[in-house]
Amino acid sequence: MTDKTSLSYKDAGVDIDAGNALVDRIKGVVKKTRRSEVMGGLGGFGALCALPQKYREPVLVSGTDGVGTKLRLAMDLKRHDAIGIDLVAMCVNDLVVQGAEPLFFLDYYATGKLDVDTAASVINGIAEGCLQSGCALVGGETAEMPGMYHGEDYDVAGFCVGVVEKSEIIDGSRVAEGDVLIALGSSGPHSNGYSLVRKIIDVSGCDPQTTLLEGKPLADHLLEPTRIYVKSVLELIENIDVHAIAHLTGGGFWENIPRVLPENTQAVINESSWQWPAIFTWLRTAGNVSRHEMYRAFNCGVGMVIALSAPEADKALALLNEKGENAWKIGIIKASDSEQRVVIE
């Protein structure tokens, strides 16, 4: 009989002990996100969550997203602390625009070789995002897959479920001529347009860690976490009759605002109502990007656009600004049968 070397899972590149060490590292921060509806703790085959009792006809709203190639920039710069916030933001902001309160969140973290410090940093960010949005982090999957990813490169995906009263779903159907559009300021490019961002960095030859913009490194502007609007928007919805909300993600103004507009309406955006944050001016100049392309690839300083009746506008602005948002009137809704659903003038 020929002697054979005894192989283990670790020999194949999967370190179960590292995975267990990660779970031990994150238990504390995950526990802080717990909601009263969550049943049980980490470690079950599935996470259990009851519906809040205040809903008469609860409708579940679900969403999933990632952070795109912002992740590549974060890995290149070895800055992982905000990626988790981005991940949660991209999911919960999509839920709240339909009037939904986020209930619970799950994450998927995949890598070629698990680095416990990096993964813990990302998941700490996820927990922070859940705290900011009032959402429970109920579970996740950490997949160490040698040969699937280069070295310690990783990818993340998030999954979120929220709930809304059936009669209070916001779907844009009540948007009408004369409605006022209110903008909520963004914290930067959020998590969209980063393939173009990275191309601009490459073509311009700049070093984002040493290139300064408004007194701080370009990298700080680009890796600023996506703003989470959940608590401000839920309070707005509770006090104001909101007709529609658009989350400005991939596709920018041109593609996201029309998603919440009824037929025969047009959003007219007043470009002079705000000044682009410096990072967008830099991207446009460094990349020689056209105005139209800027509004398609980036949010240009606007994270959400909210439609409501004109008499409610001032009250809404006061509430949002009191909650810490940078909110302003950005435009109006006009009746139009034009194929151009958004006009920026």
Swiss-Prot record:
Primary subcellular site in the record, as a coarse category: cytoplasm
Catalytic activity: 2-formamido-N(1)-(5-O-phospho-beta-D-ribosyl)acetamidine + ATP = 5-amino-1-(5-phospho-beta-D-ribosyl)imidazole + ADP + phosphate + H(+)
Keyword Acyltransferase in record: no
Gene3D superfamilies found in the cross-reference section: PurM-like C-terminal domain, PurM-like, N-terminal domain
Top-level taxon: Bacteria
GO molecular function terms noted in the UniProt entry: ATP binding; phosphoribosylamine-glycine ligase activity; phosphoribosylformylglycinamidine cyclo-ligase activity
The UniProt record lists the keyword Lipid biosynthesis: no
EC number: 6.3.3.1
Gene Ontology BP term (one): adenine biosynthetic process
Name recorded for this polypeptide: Phosphoribosylformylglycinamidine cyclo-ligase
Pathway: Purine metabolism; IMP biosynthesis via de novo pathway; 5-amino-1-(5-phospho-D-ribosyl)imidazole from N(2)-formyl-N(1)-(5-phospho-D-ribosyl)glycinamide: step 2/2
GO cellular component annotations of the record: cytosol
Keywords: ATP-binding, Cytoplasm, Ligase, Nucleotide-binding, Purine biosynthesis
Database matches in InterPro entries: PurM-like_C_dom, PurM-like_C_sf, PurM-like_N, PurM-like_N_sf, PurM_cligase
Localization per Swiss-Prot or TrEMBL: Cytoplasm
Pfam families hit by this protein: AIRS, AIRS_C
Protein family according to the UniProt entry: Belongs to the AIR synthase family.
